[in-house]
Amino acid sequence: MPIDVRREIAQRALDLVGVPYKLGGRCPLAGLDCIGVVALALAGHIMPDEVPRDYTLRGEYLDRISAFFDRALFQNLGRESMESGDLLLCQTAPRQLHMAILTDCGVVHAHAGLRRVVLTPLPLPWPLVGRWRVLGE
């Protein structure tokens, strides 16, 4: 994928830092959850409404999320080096998954406990269970 596309995704994520947290949120004014952050950062590559909405905070949606991002528009990454703009799926608890976007400054994600979108430095405190990159145009 061209570097400028990866930078655009990372910058869109960084622009959301400070936005309020809201479970299921897709609007920065009302609030975003982790998947809402990913949907808005990918604007221009996917329609935000395409991203799955029927999940719960502690739901088992790994298969649904993986199937969505494994489609043709995304490259499923194995153990390759991580790059700014990569989409990360982490397991924050035994049955709790969480999405984030890698940037050169750290990882952007919606933090339910802090009630806002935050930038967290690496390394992440959670194991990665999935990683995708938007394919180039």
Model regions and ranges:
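...with weaker cross-activation on analogous glycine-rich loops/strands in unrelated enzymes
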Residues: P2-A10, E50-P121, E137
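N-terminal intrinsically disordered, low-complexity, charge/repeat-rich segments that act as generic
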Residues: M1-L32
